[in-house]
């Protein structure tokens, strides 16, 4: 058991100012929106001030080819914010041989993200295909270096991350629409290019479900295949095990009873984390009991209230009311 202390005082304040101009329009078959402007982050760390002025943009649109097929595109260009845990000027020991070292020169991470998707219906089959592309400029990673007795962990801006994900989902109805079978195939290719890391990973996983309706009963089976993903936060590789679920629900008037069995073949959800950082090699097993074998039972009674009225046609919200930047 490690017991230690660090003495120091850090003062960090961040003021964000952003101005946006928006343009939107719509016709019978399409709508679009574009919101662009500038964001300035005024950061004061221990009496030293930095200004980070970054352009921001949010845009998108949808086109209805006909009543059964549509295309949509949504994108953004924005940046992260800071908190005292990643922008400071301190070194804190976390164990007898490990220490977290702050980086006062840490700069914002810029994100360019685009999602292109298609939704359609072919007879009793419903098809959805989407492509997600994300680029992280000035990507923030963990740099590890060591002296004779300590391994130091420092967050730093290094290189660019390229994330690509192609997913396709097909749902089909059988037995007079009482049985629905759905399958989703996901293919990812992620790259991390920089001075500290030069990594790439091809990832494929499959999700499938079968839902059967009989009277007031619903029974559903879910499955997700095992896969290995590249987590860019340090970075590291995470090896995930398959996931199995069985759900049954009963609905009668205002009563609903749901029972679910999650991962019945193992008490724990096991995740294997590996990575070679040069000065040390990470190889750990994480066991999560809440995501392992468990049984959930839920009982719901719905109380009707308010005045009933016929619902009209719903209109797609074509306006961008707000934009939320993320903490890294």
Regions inferred by a protein language model and the residue ranges of each:
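Exposed, low-structure sequence patches enriched in small/polar residues
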Residues: 1-328
């Amino acid at each position: 058991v490690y017991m230690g202390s660090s003495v120091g005082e850090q003062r960090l304040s961040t003021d964000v100012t952003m101005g946006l101009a928006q343009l939107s329009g719509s016709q019978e078959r399409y709508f679009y929106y574009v919101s662009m402007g500038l964001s300035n982050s005024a950061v004061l760390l221990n009496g030293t001030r930095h200004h980070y002025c970054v352009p921001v943009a949010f845009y998108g649109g949808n086109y209805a080819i006909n009543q059964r097929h549509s295309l949509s595109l949504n994108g953004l260009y924005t940046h992260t914010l800071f908190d005292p845990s990643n922008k400071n000027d301190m070194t804190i020991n976390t164990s007898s041989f490990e220490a977290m070292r702050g980086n006062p020169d840490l700069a914002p991470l810029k994100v360019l993200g685009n999602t292109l998707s298609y939704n359609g219906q072919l007879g009793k089959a419903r098809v959805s295909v989407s492509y997600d592309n994300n680029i992280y400029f000035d990507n923030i990673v963990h740099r590890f270096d060591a002296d004779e007795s300590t391994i130091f962990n420092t967050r730093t801006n290094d290189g660019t991350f390229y994330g690509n994900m192609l997913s396709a989902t097909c749902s089909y109805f059988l037995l007079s629409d009482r049985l629905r079978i759905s399958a989703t195939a996901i293919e990812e290719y992620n790259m991390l290019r920089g001075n500290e890391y030069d990594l790439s990973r091809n990832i494929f996983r499959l999700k499938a479900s079968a839902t059967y309706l009989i009277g007031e009963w619903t029974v559903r089976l879910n499955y997700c295949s095992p896969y290995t993903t590249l987590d860019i936060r340090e970075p590291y590789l995470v090896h995930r095990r398959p996931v199995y679920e069985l759900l049954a629900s009963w609905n009668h008037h205002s009563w609903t009873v749901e029972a679910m069995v999650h991962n019945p073949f193992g008490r724990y959800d096991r995740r294997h984390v590996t990575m070679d950082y040069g000065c040390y090699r990470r190889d750990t097993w994480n066991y999560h009991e809440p995501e392992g074998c468990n049984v959930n039972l839920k009982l719901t009674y719905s109380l009707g209230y308010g005045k009933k009225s016929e619902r009209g046609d719903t209109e797609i919200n074509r306006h961008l009311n707000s934009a939320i930047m993320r903490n890294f």
